[in-house]
Amino acid sequence: MNFIYEKEDIKKKSDNKKVGIDLGAHKLIADSNGNFYGKDLYDVYNRLANKKRGSKKYKKLLTYKKNRVNELCNKFVEDNIDCDIVCENLKNVKHKSSFYKSVNNKLQYWSYRQVIDKIETLSESKGFTLIKVDPSYTSQTCSNCGAVIKANRDGEHYHCSCGLEIDADTNAAINILRRGAYCPSLQKT
């Protein structure tokens, strides 16, 4: 059986409004406007790490996580429908690292790849551009004065000697946005 359908031509947005996003485990998406999506998912990662793989509860929770991530991505795109999106190019992220075993167990459920894939799919259907930039030092750089000091980030808070006090993920999203604004030719999809 074959289906034939007509696909509308998507008109690219002509204005240059952009939003930067920082992807994380505690907040799935933090944007440069100070909005957060998916704060509740870290609890799901914890519960998944404690469930026996293959059990009914594990599979149900995994399905819930996948559906929740899709729901959050759709909400984020709807909230920023008139903006191009600048995100981190996280192609080299490893789930196994020098963290404690318990942290590695939670990180394996982090859905960054699902988020990027979903936003890429939505970018094609909704007509916005997805720009991927190098994530190096975005969470350590002050979005106000540009100082790169690792000690300025204390968990989820960012404090700089210039007087800036901001959520660390919002600070990183602002830095990601700036990289995308100054390098518009980087890896557009």
Feature names for model-found ranges:
Residues M1-T189:
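Positively charged, helix-rich recognition surfaces that bind polyanionic ligands
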